[in-house]
């Protein structure tokens, strides 16, 4: 893939040899069924969708509102010769149809947002008028059937993306929802997902060395735990994994916990 070393996030991809968000990489490589559709919402450079295409042979829909980053995703798809199985939608997923302002973070290339408060003191970047719509509208021609993974990273607009799913927020439609929720959206997002029939898991707080050791065990076929059930009394900050309650993935994660002791 193309890497711009002037970008903080892409520089991280370069120096870690692509090992960016390793727990999410494990979800993609080990939990997404082979050939299942993947939606990478808030794609940035497209790294997660590209991993899904490479390791799971997944057809991928990339959603990226920033014009420069959307073009980067297109080039990365073309560099791999995957134009026939991947598409890029240059728009923002939301809960309503219309136009919006995308605020560019001048310092952090992964923190552009529809929320000016999210960008905060780094509001020195440009502003773009962009198209926004619920995901079912943006992907209206997506073949009906299960989506193996919906990854949402909308920089403070994640709850609106969830709300905009409508009938798509269904365990029969979505196999995995991977989303970052912050502030009051944690409580609202949890309630929305649980009402729809999903159960949540949060990332274990691990030091990098310990995380790498557990990943080596998992990729070697040994049991280890990267994600723990979200307790009823609290909702973690940051990235969370949601799967159909009582489904195969939930049982698999529970079995890993049991075997790992």
Regions found by a protein language model. Name each.
Residues 1-261:
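Phosphate/nucleotide-binding beta-alpha loop and adjacent structural elements of enzyme active sites
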């Amino acid at each position: 893939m193309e890497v711009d070393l002037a970008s903080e996030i892409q520089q991280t991809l370069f120096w870690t040899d692509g090992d960016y968000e390793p727990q999410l990489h494990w979800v993609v490589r080990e939990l997404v069924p082979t050939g299942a559709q993947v939606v990478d919402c808030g794609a940035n450079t497209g790294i997660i969708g590209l991993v899904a295409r490479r390791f799971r042979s997944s057809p991928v829909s990339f959603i990226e509102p920033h014009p420069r980053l959307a073009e980067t995703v297109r080039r990365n798809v073309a560099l791999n010769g995957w134009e026939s199985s991947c598409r890029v939608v240059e728009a923002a997923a939301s809960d309503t149809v219309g136009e919006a302002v995308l605020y560019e973070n001048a310092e952090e290339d992964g923190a552009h947002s529809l929320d000016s408060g999210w960008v905060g003191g780094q509001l020195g970047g440009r502003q773009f008028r962009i198209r926004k719509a619920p995901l079912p509208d943006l992907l209206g021609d997506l073949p009906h059937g299960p989506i193996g993974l919906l990854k949402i990273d909308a920089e403070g607009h994640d709850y609106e993306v969830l709300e905009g799913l409508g009938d798509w927020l269904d365990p029969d439609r979505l196999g995995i929802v991977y989303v970052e929720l912050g502030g009051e959206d944690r409580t609202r997002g949890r309630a929305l997902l649980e009402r729809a029939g999903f159960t949540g898991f949060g990332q274990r707080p691990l030091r990098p060395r310990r995380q790498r050791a557990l990943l080596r065990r998992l990729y070697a076929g040994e049991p280890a735990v990267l994600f723990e059930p979200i307790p009823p009394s609290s909702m973690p900050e940051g990235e969370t994994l949601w799967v159909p309650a009582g489904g195969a993935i939930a049982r698999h994660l529970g079995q890993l916990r049991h075997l790992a002791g």
